Amino acid sequence: MLKGHLHSVESMGTVDGPGLRYILFTQGCLLRCLYCHNPDTWKINEPSREVTVDEMVNEILPYKPYFEASGGGVTVSGGEPLLQMPFLEQLFKELKANGVHTCIDTSAGCVNDTPAFNRHFDELQKHTDLILLDIKHIDNDKHIKLTGKPNTHILKFARKLSDMKQPVWIRHVLVPGISDDKEDLIKLGEFINSLDNVEKFEILPYHQLGVHKWKNLGIPYQLENVEPPDDEAVKEAYRYVNFNGKIPVTL
């Protein structure tokens, strides 16, 4: 029986998609982001909770009244959820059959052009209402330094989603001295504004809430002396990106 490998769940999330959301954090990720707040999700073979589709649907459906009242639903994050597409295909198909909004939060690090990947993603996309795409850095060399992987396949994937008319929110973590360069943010905005499917752009201010996990795993944390950006730096970044010619009115 097909099973998913989960790191954890959050029953009432409010930041990973619209409304109140049940969030599944999957195990396994190919990127090694310097600021990752879930480094304990990197290894897909680490001890994790194995679940069937039926088990998860039964856990999720009692929350449906909250989804309906808030415009929420289910978000699968990670880790990297696209490493477990066969499981997600079945899960999202069942959730949609029960009238639940579905969302994937991905950094697209595992995206590739193999027939197997494209076949599974095309099937998964049929049952996916929204994708949150994290673009870590628009500059390829800086992306490699930040995550350990290039960004060329990620940007290509963003264009594919645009061609598919798949609704997308794009998110960018703002790290002082790493991903806050003016010219890079302007280029990021030009790229985003060239896509036809982006409903929302969000800047996520860097934080250190996951540093203790790095220490518990015995992994050196290279950004320990980096302070989170202040509100003015975040506003300035929004102005540089200039998504659709405006900045969020809620700042």
From Swiss-Prot:
Chief location category: cytoplasm
Domain Radical SAM core as annotated: residue spans: 15-244
Catalytic activity, as annotated: glycyl-[formate C-acetyltransferase] + reduced [flavodoxin] + S-adenosyl-L-methionine = glycin-2-yl radical-[formate C-acetyltransferase] + semiquinone [flavodoxin] + 5'-deoxyadenosine + L-methionine + H(+)
Disulfide bond residue pairs: none
Molecular function per GO: 4 iron, 4 sulfur cluster binding; [formate-C-acetyltransferase]-activating enzyme activity; metal ion binding
Domain of life of the organism encoding this protein: Bacteria
Cell location: Cytoplasm
Annotated GO CC locations: cytoplasm
Cofactor(s), names only, from the UniProt record: [4Fe-4S] cluster
Positions with a binding annotation for S-adenosyl-L-methionine: 35-37, 79, 134-136, 207
Cofactor binding, per record: Binds 1 [4Fe-4S] cluster. The cluster is coordinated with 3 cysteines and an exchangeable S-adenosyl-L-methionine.
Binding site for [4Fe-4S] cluster: 29, 33, 36
E.C. no: 1.97.1.4
PROSITE patterns membership: RADICAL_ACTIVATING (PS01087), RADICAL_SAM (PS51918)
Top enzyme class: oxidoreductase
Entry keyword set: 4Fe-4S, Carbohydrate metabolism, Cytoplasm, Glucose metabolism, Iron, Iron-sulfur, Metal-binding, Oxidoreductase, S-adenosyl-L-methionine
One record GO biological process: glucose metabolic process
Purpose of the protein: Activation of pyruvate formate-lyase under anaerobic conditions by generation of an organic free radical, using S-adenosylmethionine and reduced flavodoxin as cosubstrates to produce 5'-deoxy-adenosine.
Family label: Belongs to the organic radical-activating enzymes family.
Protein name: Pyruvate formate-lyase-activating enzyme
Gene assigned in the entry: pflA
